[in-house]
Amino acid sequence: MAQENAAFSPGQEEPPRRRGRQRYVEKDGRCNVQQGNVRETYRYLTDLFTTLVDLQWRLSLLFFVLAYALTWLFFGAIWWLIAYGRGDLEHLEDTAWTPCVNNLNGFVAAFLFSIETETTIGYGHRVITDQCPEGIVLLLLQAILGSMVNAFMVGCMFVKISQPNKRAATLVFSSHAVVSLRDGRLCLMFRVGDLRSSHIVEASIRAKLIRSRQTLEGEFIPLHQTDLSVGFDTGDDRLFLVSPLVISHEIDAASPFWEASRRALERDDFEIVVILEGMVEATGMTCQARSSYLVDEVLWGHRFTSVLTLEDGFYEVDYASFHETFEVPTPSCSARELAEAAARLDAHLYWSIPSRLDEKVEEEGAGEGAGGEAGADKEQNGCLPPPESESKV
């Protein structure tokens, strides 16, 4: 009977509760790390484009509005200063006077003229004249700088909108990882799936074990990262993620769980971070989805429930059972102990089979007696009969 996310087998004593480990990576993929005491903040300004893209949406929109409003105000103030310096504001009623900008009678009019110039929406009755060289230079500068502001801000907003972060939200990981036998070997497994019909191209999976360790010299490393092989050597880490897949890490001699039994694993303190990467089929941009598993989320002796069924002409995926597991017979010893036991069993079988064959030969030979020459020419238990003797004349 299927059981969903059961942590222990019936009748088995639950290990003592430990203090909850602080996650390094949240289940939704957010890294639980905050940068503190960063004194060289000028480095953020050297890469202003990335800084603006990484801002929250409300701050990005605020910067977007301020960028345009400030440039309009800045150039509007300069247009007003030119008109004030040339005396245009004092000759508003003088028809013989040629101003720098026609019908510019105050700061508000200068501000509106600045907006019309930078946005190139066309002029109304405010038009620059050819009697104002400083105005012509300012017009060129505002046109060039306005184009630069447009390119920069529109580029930032486009990149921010087209970021594949939301695409990663439709890449799901199983809520638990499991440990069970696969082809006679202990394996750590978890499941990944894609909720969208458009696929992830060149998808690849990685897994890292994060736990504290102490070196031989006494150095304490609080978040040491160790790679967990999920098929890099065989190419199994490259996924064709059309339907949910179970990713397997074989616990062999190169695995950090080689000597971990069920009891030792439940008492350990670690975090397994899984990273799924690929390109979004629609945009070609790289997408990365992350999740993690703590010790309490690793179920020993469980296997994932199948979610794929064959219907009339197509395969159907039932995501209602995506996170479900069920218990299977699994030894509680470590992978090393299991391999040693299998080696001893193989050695015992290797030496016991010839001895049993010899015993069978002796029993059959004693039953036939000395007069059983007819059966002497037959093969017995894989042994060839002796060659025939020469006939006597």
From Swiss-Prot:
Residues 83-106, 126-134 are extracellular. Gene3D superfamilies: 1.10.287.70, G protein-activated inward rectifier potassium channel 1. One of its GO terms (cellular component) is inward rectifier potassium channel complex. It catalyses: K(+)(in) = K(+)(out). The chain crosses the membrane at residues 58-82, 135-156. It is found in: Membrane. This is G protein-activated inward rectifier potassium channel 3. It comes from Homo sapiens (Human). The gene is KCNJ9.
